[in-house]
Amino acid sequence: MTNQGAIPVIVNGAAGKMGREVVKAVAQAADLTLFGAVDRNPSLQGQDIGEVVGIGPLEVPLLADLQSLLVAAAQEPQAGVMVDFTHPNSVYDNVRMAIAYGVRPVVGTTGLSPEQIRDLATFADKASMGCLIIPNFSIGMVLLQQAAIQASQYFDHVEIIELHHNQKADAPSGTALQTAQLLAELGKTYNPPAVKETEHLAGARGSLAEEGIRIHSVRLPGLIAHQEVIFGAPGQVYTLRHDTSDRSCYMPGVLLAIRKVMNLETVVYGLEKIL
């Protein structure tokens, strides 16, 4: 099932929008091999995942049981990597299970709480097992966040707007929360009040993140993934925006994460940490 010397990869959530792109990218990478594909879609069980994603047969059946694949992977000379693009309700258990079987997780599913991330870090440390948790695999988004950090030196007012397709289950997005966290870690408080505000509808001013940063979430069909970071000062507005037009833009980051996680022994959060 594996190519000699290649990193075995299990794609969890393989029939989803992101999972399909990961399957294609892994199948085309010479130093990776698709060890297994997992998805709970009952209509696709047993089908060749290559046929499901439209690239021809890969001789890898789509299965529903993640644990059985992790058991099989643990018996390989190199246990490899599990890439998880599933659901906020299942990702925590998926990651713990992978670590327990010696398979390194690369996590693209958002929705993990800070407490869950800390618990996974403790679990991974005890196992000396690498794990990457990455809210956004886009190089462009990393550049936007770096530009926002630089801009925050000169602006005291900032708000974040994130826009996603209406199938996204969590809000705010992990990327927006990460952006707010990066700005909050700079040691300043944003958006000093100019007036006493009254919300006539609950949530009209968005959700309040750390250090006074507000995040607004939009969910509509037709969107993929978009984020604006808007800075304001008297007489000027500075807007940073990143737009995703195709999910293939995430694949260079996913492939980099698969390769990098093999040399880690703890949890690392954010693509910028491995660039």
From Swiss-Prot:
Q: Enumerate the PROSITE patterns for this protein.
A: DAPB
The listed locations are:
Cytoplasm
Q: Identify the species of origin.
A: Cyanothece sp. (strain PCC 7425 / ATCC 29141)
Instruction: Supply the InterPro entries for this chain.
Output: DapB_C (IPR022663), DapB_N (IPR000846), DapB_N_CS (IPR022664), DHDPR_bac (IPR023940), NAD(P)-bd_dom_sf (IPR036291)
Task: Provide the GO biological process annotations.
Answer: diaminopimelate biosynthetic process; lysine biosynthetic process via diaminopimelate
Q: Which family does it belong to?
A: Belongs to the DapB family.
Which taxonomic lineage is given here?
A: Bacteria, Bacillati, Cyanobacteriota, Cyanophyceae, Gomontiellales
Question: Which residues are involved in binding (S)-2,3,4,5-tetrahydrodipicolinate?
Answer: H165, G174, T175
Q: Which reaction does it catalyse?
A: (S)-2,3,4,5-tetrahydrodipicolinate + NAD(+) + H2O = (2S,4S)-4-hydroxy-2,3,4,5-tetrahydrodipicolinate + NADH + H(+); (S)-2,3,4,5-tetrahydrodipicolinate + NADP(+) + H2O = (2S,4S)-4-hydroxy-2,3,4,5-tetrahydrodipicolinate + NADPH + H(+)
CDD domains linked to this entry:
DHDPR_N
- Which residues make up the binding site for NAD(+)? G13, A14, A15, G16, K17, M18, G108, T109, T110
Q: What is its main location?
A: cytoplasm
Residues forming the catalytic site: H164 (proton donor/acceptor), K168 (proton donor)
A GO molecular function term, named singly, is: NAD binding
The protein's name is 4-hydroxy-tetrahydrodipicolinate reductase
Which EC numbers characterise this protein's activity in its record?
1.17.1.8
